[in-house]
């Protein structure tokens, strides 16, 4: 990879970034297309976030990804936010265009592309969304726009109600459930999506309180976590014969869309898959 005065800079801002796979995914794609671009991990403490975002203009970055915990916090520092990102309430991709920083959300369409890749149809289907935080918002928006009937389960009912209120004009949210000690039956649903940190470090031995009784091979278990590749939730689902998808697929497709926005060209998807350990 060549780096010179004409190299266009991209990257990811978040905290922490120790386990991010995005740099290797994007840099391998740049290399494959012989593009003079570089993708950097930019670990930024919260008190330095304003300077970091404004610095994108100073250092003439072409764009960046935004990850936890800043997807909602970057809004005040942007010149423009795309309508979809405003509705979702989160920005995960920023494009620097002629001195203006424009915020987008590629998580939602990336999630839908991951469903398409895995031949999962959600139109008219009942989907259980586990969680109502920042990660859940993009998934909820994606599912609702695809015509799914959404049921939201969260430990804090008020937060689930807030999400439902924000998206009441987007699609059908038919029920809000309390995610507590009493397990929620998965049997009535076509798919369940875990957006909670239960299953990732340091909660590897935990999963949402759900009951797998009645789950069949038609059921789809989706976990946004990709490290570990198989969470306790996915493992239990697989043991019941269900189809399972981890977060690598969404990571890939949101990255594909961000890549296109920065470069104006379609990335080599197979190269990106290989870079993050996804089978082609």
From Swiss-Prot:
NADP(+) binds at residues 131-135, 154-159, 224, 247. One of its GO terms (biological process) is aromatic amino acid family biosynthetic process. Pathway: Metabolic intermediate biosynthesis; chorismate biosynthesis; chorismate from D-erythrose 4-phosphate and phosphoenolpyruvate: step 4/7. It comes from the Bacteria. GO terms for molecular function: NADP binding; shikimate 3-dehydrogenase (NADP+) activity. The keyword NADP applies. The keyword Lipid metabolism does not apply. Its EC number is 1.1.1.25. It is an enzyme of class 1 (oxidoreductase). The active site is at residue 71. Keywords: Amino-acid biosynthesis, Aromatic amino acid biosynthesis, NADP, Oxidoreductase. Disulfide bonds: none annotated. Signal peptide: none annotated. It catalyses: shikimate + NADP(+) = 3-dehydroshikimate + NADPH + H(+). Shikimate binds at residues 20-22, 67, 92, 107, 226. Involved in the biosynthesis of the chorismate, which leads to the biosynthesis of aromatic amino acids. Catalyzes the reversible NADPH linked reduction of 3-dehydroshikimate (DHSA) to yield shikimate (SA). HAMAP family: Shikimate_DH_AroE (MF_00222). NCBIfam families: aroE, PRK00258.2-2, PRK00258.3-3. Homodimer. Belongs to the shikimate dehydrogenase family. This is Shikimate dehydrogenase (NADP(+)). The lineage of its organism: Bacteria, Bacillati, Bacillota, Clostridia, Thermoanaerobacterales.
């Amino acid at each position: 990879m060549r780096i010179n005065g004409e190299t266009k800079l991209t990257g990811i801002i978040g905290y922490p970034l120790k386990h991010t796979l995005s740099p290797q995914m994007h840099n391998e794609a740049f290399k494959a297309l012989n593009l003079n671009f570089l993708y950097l991990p930019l670990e930024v403490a919260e008190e330095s976030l304003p300077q970091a975002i404004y610095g994108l203009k100073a250092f003439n970055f072409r764009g960046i990804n935004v990850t936890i915990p800043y997807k909602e916090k970057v809004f005040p520092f942007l010149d423009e936010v795309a309508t979809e990102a405003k509705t979702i309430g989160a920005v995960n991709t920023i494009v620097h265009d002629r001195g203006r920083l424009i915020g987008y959300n590629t998580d939602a369409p990336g999630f839908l592309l991951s469903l398409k890749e895995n031949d999962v149809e959600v139109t008219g289907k009942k989907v259980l969304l586990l969680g109502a935080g920042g990660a859940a918002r993009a998934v909820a928006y994606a599912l609702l726009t695809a015509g799914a009937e959404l049921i939201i389960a969260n430990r804090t009912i008020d937060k689930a109600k807030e999400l439902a209120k924000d998206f009441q004009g987007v699609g059908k949210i038919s029920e809000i459930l309390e995610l507590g000690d009493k397990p929620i039956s998965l049997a009535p649903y076509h798919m369940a999506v875990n957006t909670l940190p239960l299953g990732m470090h340091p909660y590897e031995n935990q999963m949402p309180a759900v009951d797998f009784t009645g789950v069949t091979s038609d059921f789809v278990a989706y976990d946004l976590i990709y490290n570990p590749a198989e969470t306790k939730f996915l493992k239990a689902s697989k043991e019941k014969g269900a189809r399972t998808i981890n977060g690598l697929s969404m990571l890939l497709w949101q990255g594909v869309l961000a890549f296109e926005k920065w470069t104006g060209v379609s990335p080599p998807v197979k190269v990106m898959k290989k870079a993050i350990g996804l089978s082609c």
